[in-house]
A protein has these predicted regions:
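Conserved alpha/beta enzyme-core scaffold
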Residues: 1-360
């Protein structure tokens, strides 16, 4: 009771340890659990076991749809921090974790466990933890990069997990309006650009159109690595001929299909790294012709953009959108696109403008 825990990040959130902790619900109280994006289709076992949050206080710095539902139900809280600052936030601005838990790939011959397709803020968490428990998953992919291993000498306990398949996400198909937006954007992208594409049906459709175009000699420097880049690679569009991290596809975490994970696994072209480097505006801007493509929720006539919340309901989190907008702005020949339909249709069939005179 009273412990402060971290559950891991993205595809590295723990499964078997979560299940084991949930079985102890009635004997524990005042246990705080932090994570970034619970990525599985079902809520964490601790939330299912404690729907009224009487024993566990669960907080995420970036909501998934499951976490949004739990937030509405009253047993999941939002942890407000900008993604790029998470490493420093956990290491310097939060209490020391009693236990950090994370899923990892099996140990290699050097005694290292690969962190899988995410580094993000891991080391801010791990450096500020009294105990570290790794849950070994034979399905966890090996992702090359930097700061992407933890050695057995740094680990207190090793749990051989049940080898749960990695969580996958399948982007929705772009609708007709999004397809038209994508057509406008692709006309403005030049050969030799470095790409950051957001997630969802719209950015994926942008990637599809680029793959079908005569644009070539492209590179990748992005927060989230998604299936769109796989399709661009298959189309022969990616050369990695950028100014920094040449020949590498650079990102801080990856999520997508199993096909994407299979491509990433033990692929020397991949470069996953810590978020404070990957999302650093000064690093991003070193790439010439940096192109950032993201969606937003609302915009007003003063140029203010809302990309995070609908009223009092938080949608995701404070990710790297601003970092890539500014990185593209500072880049030589860079371009940034924030995209949204002009209207949305409400449940009663009426239309509402997403372009406001002023945002609240």
């Amino acid at each position: 009771s009273g412990d402060y825990l971290h559950y891991g990040l993205f595809t590295g959130v723990v499964v078997d340890l979560d299940t084991a902790l949930a079985k102890r619900t009635q004997e524990l109280e005042d246990v705080t659990i932090c994570t970034t994006m619970w990525s599985y289709a079902e809520p964490p076992a601790v939330l299912q076991a404690d729907p009224k949050a009487e024993h566990f206080h669960y907080a995420s710095s970036h909501f998934t749809p499951i976490e949004r539902k739990c937030n509405k139900a009253g047993n999941c809280w939002f942890l407000p921090v900008q993604f790029r600052e998470n490493t420093k936030f956990y290491e310097e601005c939060r209490p020391t974790f009693d236990v950090a838990m994370l899923q990892v790939a099996p140990m290699d011959k050097s005694g290292n466990f690969n962190l899988g397709p995410q580094v993000a803020e891991y080391w801010g968490i791990l450096r500020n933890s009294k105990k570290i428990i790794v849950e070994v998953n034979e399905n966890m992919i090996v992702n090359h990069g930097f700061e992407n291993y933890i050695n057995i000498s740094q680990v207190d306990y090793v749990v051989e997990g049940s080898n749960t398949p990695l969580p996958t996400i399948n982007a929705k198909e772009a609708n007709d309006v999004e397809k038209k937006m994508a057509e406008h954007i692709v006309k403005l992208i030049e050969s030799g650009s470095t790409l950051q594409l957001g997630t969802g049906g719209f950015p994926n459709y942008v990637g599809k159109l680029i793959a079908e175009s005569d644009i070539n000699d492209l590179s990748v420097h992005t927060e989230m690595f998604v299936d769109a880049y796989l399709h661009l690679f298959q189309a022969g569009k990616l050369t990695g001929n950028k100014k920094i991290n040449k020949g590498k596809m650079t990102y801080t975490f990856a999520m997508g299909s199993q096909e994407l994970y299979d491509w990433i696994n033990d692929n020397q072209m991949m470069q996953v790294g810590p978020v404070e480097y990957i999302n650093d505006v000064d690093v991003i801007s070193q790439n010439d012709k940096m192109v950032s493509v993201n969606s937003c929720l609302q915009v007003d006539l003063f140029g203010q953009v809302n990309s995070e919340s609908a009223g009092l309901q938080h949608i995701g989190g404070t990710g790297g959108q601003l970092d890539y907008v500014m990185g593209a702005f500072k880049s030589n020949g860079g371009k940034s696109f924030l995209c949204l339909p002009s209207t949305r249709t409400l449940k009663d069939g009426t239309k509402e403008s997403l372009i406001r005179a002023t945002l609240p």
